Amino acid sequence: MCGIVGYTGKNSALTPVVDGLRKLEYRGYDSAGIALPTEIGKPLFIEKKAGKLKNLEDALAKTPNATSGIGHTRWATHGGPTDTNAHPHLDNEGKLALIHNGIIENYVQLRTELEKRGHKFKSETDTESVVHLLSDARKENNGDLAAAMRQVCKQLKGSFTLLAIHSDDPSHIVGARRNSPLVVGVGNGENFLASDVAAFIAHTKIALELGQDEVVEITPTSVEVTNLAGQVVKSKQYEISWDASAAERGGFPHFMLKEIYEQPKAIADTLIGRLDGLNVKIKFKKFEKIVIIACGTAYNAGLVGKYAIEKWGQIPVDVELASEYRYREPSLDKKTLVIPISQSGETMDTLMALRYAKSKGATIFSVCNTNGSTIGRESDAVLYTHAGPEIAVASTKAFATQLIAMYLIGLEIGKQLDHLSKKESKVIIEQLSALPAKVEQVLETVEPLRELTRKFKDSQSVLFLGRHVGYPTALEGALKLKELAYMHAEGFAGGELKHGPIALIDKGTPVVAIMPAEHSVLAEKMASNIQEVKARGAVVIAISEFDFIGADHLIRIPKTDQLLQPVLSVVPLQVIAYEMAVARGNDVDQPRNLAKSVTVE
């Protein structure tokens, strides 16, 4: 949530800052702004607009030149999405600008104290308290903005990424982070600060991640990181493995559709070098239970993981909503393995649950897509999914690779605990290896979904039914439709229909059914469920690996092991949600009210 960009160098700052904000649009926002020091010691040039980034760009048609600047896309938490509440915020002299991602929990107390000291506030935000506090601290530290930032961070409660710039020292930008991402881009005669490497990858592939409660000061030729005590921290640089073109649409009308079609490669990349074993220093024999913690789509991937790990590894698995987990004081200890799943590696609820589990002695083995992320760094081991950048807010290829990660972990546990024979492991490996090609096959057959889906664009409700691993797949299908089409959608286990949900069925209600493997007991059960809803007027769309004749519309997928079926059956569900959103005229890549990376609780 929120996008942050800072640039200082030899070139005009306007282009890299605005372009960087554009690359961060996927994070979700409702306003945008920029601050530029155009004259030393004079008030900063500032422009901010509610709405889309284009509103800001239109207002920047005649902007004075500056070689440094900071920019921000805001997701409203304190105060509505207005020009006034948009970032950056200024001190009373207009020389100091600050942008912020996160939530300052003690801002009311700070604001009250600052108002007593004569500070004038213009917005309703928690951020404005910080810029006034920083202004005072800078004066107390003889104009040293980095020292002032360290002082201020000690007074703040909550989570934050902060960036500040002052017109007295226009080439210096100071940043800080606590429980919220901030990364440095190290260039040649220019340096960057941003919430995500996507903001500056067109300019440099050398990055540096900040640790918890660290402060960074950049100039065009230097980067210095310190802790809150002022001690210099040696931060490790790394090279970004993907290129700028990966963040472009590549001829597709939307990022989401591009990412749906990138799934075969993402799956293959996640499997490479791992089918013979995971290179992690974890001995699974010491654990008595496993807890998977995640949110949203990652939670649904975790539910599938439970089936695989319990089947192949014969160890109990709980799947928990990260936002609820630590508040119920769960029982866990050194014999518990906790697996957090997060695409960004910065999901605040998941990070807080991870820290709670770690404090109780649990071992943390995380699944992330983003190298160098906070969750990855704070884990005992991490399995990176190699999905590449996922720009669309609604997750597709990240979900597919999270499923693959779950299977790889289940396979590793099964082998380590001797619950899988060499023959059984070989069959699983062969089935996993075949998945990229099978997803390609599914993608070749989804074109008819466009016309079919649009028939139901005005439906009041859509139900998704599944059994076994088809149930979490149904949950994911319903979530995608809610996110993108803004329609009421629910996912249910087929056997639960008669316990209440069947009351939702009316004439013409679309029901998407995920069929289990042919000739299985569950396939027979699902066929009965379908007859129940059809008898009440439902229109049934079945996703099946065999020619099921009981549906009104059939979407065929290739055969695979039942545990692996979600990788294939979810693809038509993603396409259904995408086409429904397009038919309803919605913003596919940036659905309303949603953010890609949820970095607040």
Residue map of PLM features:
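Conserved short alpha-helical segments that host acidic/polar catalytic motifs at enzyme active sites
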Residues: 1-249, 253, 262-286, 300, ...
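A SIS-like phosphosugar-recognition module
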Residues: 168-169, 180-182, 188-189, 207-251, ...
